[in-house]
């Protein structure tokens, strides 16, 4: 597979050219058939029609450029209520929210943390979990999602 950065550089202009924000992407290897999930967003909200149009455009680009070797499924989606967080700017936008974080490697014997995103300083997040405060560099986070509050 192409590097994630290469895919990002290839696909971001396509998504933005269609009036959407490129929120992020996941590439999940699943045996013989992998999954490429692209998240798009819009201020007015993402409709199924938006996902369909962006999917067709991205599919055409991927067919021509062929950056992914082997079979894969392309999925285009809105980030949803439990939106994943991919970069520092997105973390900053959700300061004060409850988030779930899964680290690439264990910290204090665990990889999963859920707490209040208290701050973002430089490229690190400050997460308050009960009475404890943890500081994690964004680069050490494997996956993070906003926890919807109803």
Swiss-Prot record:
Required for maturation of 30S ribosomal subunits. One of its GO terms (biological process) is ribosomal small subunit assembly. It is found in: Cytoplasm. The lineage of its organism: Bacteria, Pseudomonadati, Pseudomonadota, Gammaproteobacteria, Oceanospirillales. It comes from the Bacteria. It comes from Hahella chejuensis (strain KCTC 2396). PANTHER family: RIBOSOME MATURATION FACTOR RIMP. Keywords: Cytoplasm, Ribosome biogenesis. Pfam families: DUF150_C (PF17384), RimP_N (PF02576). The keyword Cytoplasm applies. The keyword Acyltransferase does not apply. InterPro entries: Ribosome_maturation_RimP (IPR003728), RimP_C (IPR028998), RimP_C_sf (IPR036847), RimP_N (IPR028989), RimP_N_sf (IPR035956). This is Ribosome maturation factor RimP. One of its GO terms (cellular component) is cytosol. Belongs to the RimP family.
């Amino acid at each position: 597979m192409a590097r994630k950065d290469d895919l990002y550089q290839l696909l971001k202009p396509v998504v933005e050219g269609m009036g959407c924000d490129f929120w992020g992407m996941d590439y999940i290897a699943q045996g013989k058939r992998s999954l490429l999930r692209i998240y798009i967003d819009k201020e007015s909200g993402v409709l199924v029609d938006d996902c369909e149009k962006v999917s067709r455009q991205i599919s055409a680009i991927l067919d021509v450029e062929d950056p992914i070797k082997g079979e894969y499924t392309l999925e285009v989606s809105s980030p949803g209520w439990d939106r994943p967080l991919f970069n520092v700017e997105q973390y900053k936008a959700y300061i004060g929210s409850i988030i779930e974080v899964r680290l690439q490697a264990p910290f204090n014997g665990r990889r999963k943390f859920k707490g209040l995103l208290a701050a973002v300083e430089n490229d690190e997040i400050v997460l308050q979990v009960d009475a404890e405060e943890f500081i994690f560099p964004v680069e050490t986070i494997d996956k993070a999602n906003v926890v919807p509050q109803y």
